[in-house]
């Protein structure tokens, strides 16, 4: 069965994303669980998670799909960015688990000039493995491909 959905806003609260998707006659939808433009995330309260799950049930929409924030770069050459990227991926997997979201979309990032494409791929694989090991639940990570711009990982799988 084909499902149609859109990326919807979480403005106001996470459960409003479900209502917005329903108002658009979506069968499924994608969202951010937090601002995509900053590293820090406000914790999701148990009440917020429950309201989100109840909205999914009430509107019969699913599965919900989460999208990683824009800042993480699991292929990063700089150690501090790489570490923050793994932390954020792990944190986002835990947020998905808390909300009952089965899928998390992530960009693969950009490798540094010194690292090169192959090392960038290896870093992404390692980052994803570590985040899966360190997180709760069984959320599936979906890898978003790119247009194969300079230094991107995910534009080709060669």
Model segments located where?
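N-terminal pre-domain/capping segments
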Residues: 1-91
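Active-site acidic/histidine proton-transfer and metal-coordination neighborhood
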Residues: 74-158
């Amino acid at each position: 069965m084909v499902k149609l959905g859109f990326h919807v806003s979480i403005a106001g609260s996470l459960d409003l994303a479900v209502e917005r998707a329903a108002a658009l006659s979506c069968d499924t939808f994608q969202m951010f669980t937090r601002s995509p433009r900053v590293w820090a995330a406000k914790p999701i309260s148990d009440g917020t998670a429950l309201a989100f799950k109840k909205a999914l049930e009430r509107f019969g929409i699913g599965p919900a799909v989460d999208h990683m924030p824009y800042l993480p770069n699991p292929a990063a050459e700089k150690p501090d960015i790489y570490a923050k990227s793994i932390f954020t991926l792990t944190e986002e997997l835990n947020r998905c688990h808390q909300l009952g979201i089965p899928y998390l979309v992530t960009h693969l990032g950009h490798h540094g000039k010194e690292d090169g494409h192959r090392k960038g791929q290896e870093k992404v694989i390692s980052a994803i493995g570590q985040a899966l090991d360190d997180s709760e639940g069984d959320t599936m990570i979906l890898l978003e491909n790119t247009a194969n711009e300079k230094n991107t990982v995910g534009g080709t799988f060669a």
